[in-house]
Amino acid sequence: MSGSIRDILEEKLARFEKLENDMSDPEVLSDGARMSATAREHGGLNRLANQYRTFKRLTDEIHQCVAMVADAEDVDEREMAESEMESLRKERETVWEDLLSLTVGGEDSHRTRCVMEIRAGTGGDEAALFARDLFEMYTRYAEKVGWKTELMDASPTEMGGFKDVTLTLEGDNVFRDLQYESGGHRVQRVPETETQGRVHTSAATVAVMPEPEDVEIDLKPDDYRKDFFGASGPGGQHVNKTDSAVRLTHHETGIVVQCQDEKSQHKNLAKALRVLKARIYEKKREEEAAKQAEARKGLIGSGDRSQRIRTYNFPQNRLTDHRINLTIYKLDQIIAGDLNPVTEALIEYDRDQLRGDMID
């Protein structure tokens, strides 16, 4: 097993064991919010930790069989040890495949909550409509696989698109599967306003960030500035007479987030804090990823937002993912929420990059 994958597995097992200890700590037990966050993260790591423990046990038993074969005093004893070793290796290969599925997304693949930001790029109104289409594609996909979604903030346009929209998603494997969506998305189609039937190209960017638990990002009120203002609707018109919209500016990083989706200032503040924590955590992840770039350079789950990852060609009903040269002529189904063929191909690609790195 390569050092990077072994390190990820060891770190996750150590984290799981710490969470196990924390769940019996009186201080944690007395804090409902902390206990809930600890139990949620523990549950997300449970399968991986147990499978890795099984993998390590099987590896030890294989080593024992190797020694038994070497020390065998007769043919029967050696054949028995070889047969046992072959059985253990087959069992370990099955466990290893499962571990690959669980670790292919990196150290945050176990996260059950994430924040997604979709922003219109070049292309004016058509780009904003494409951003809306992406938003609807992801929410339909979430509904199909049983994830919960929550709208955090949106800047709608008069034509029904989005300049930008932020949502959270929660469920099993949510970050592992959606992290591959980070990057530049390009659309080629004939806009509704196009009278001569010409195909236009426009773009949007998607950023997917794991949502950290409250105990992981210690954010104090002095760490950020709060600004309150009136919420606005399509075209910028004022839609709220009270200053219910919230803008937060993190002093250390300069990160700015805002939320105006709720009528309540308190609810908007709570949502904005969740997004801010995710953005801060993502910045830390990016800094750590830069240090580990060499170890993970062959994987595509790094989420480089500057990278153009995908083209949606409506006249040809074609989706192309440029990272793995994947082309699917079922764009209508994918836009309707059937994202599985794309997601599974991306995960399998990364899994293949790791498949040969098993411990002997």
UniProtKB/Swiss-Prot annotation:
Cross-referenced Pfam families: PCRF, RF-1
Protein name: Peptide chain release factor 1
Coiled coil: none
Origin: domain of life: Bacteria
Function (record text): Peptide chain release factor 1 directs the termination of translation in response to the peptide chain termination codons UAG and UAA.
Positions of post-translational N5-methylglutamine modification: Q237
Gene Ontology cellular component annotations, sorted alphabetically: cytoplasm
InterPro entries the UniProt entry points to: PCRF, Pep_chain_release_fac_I, Pep_chain_release_fac_I_sf, Prokaryotic/Mito_RF, RF-1
Database matches in SMART domains: PCRF
GO MF assignments: translation release factor activity, codon specific
Keyword Cytoplasm: yes
Keywords: Cytoplasm, Methylation, Protein biosynthesis
Similarity remark: Belongs to the prokaryotic/mitochondrial release factor family.
PTM notes: Methylated by PrmC. Methylation increases the termination efficiency of RF1.
Cellular location(s): Cytoplasm
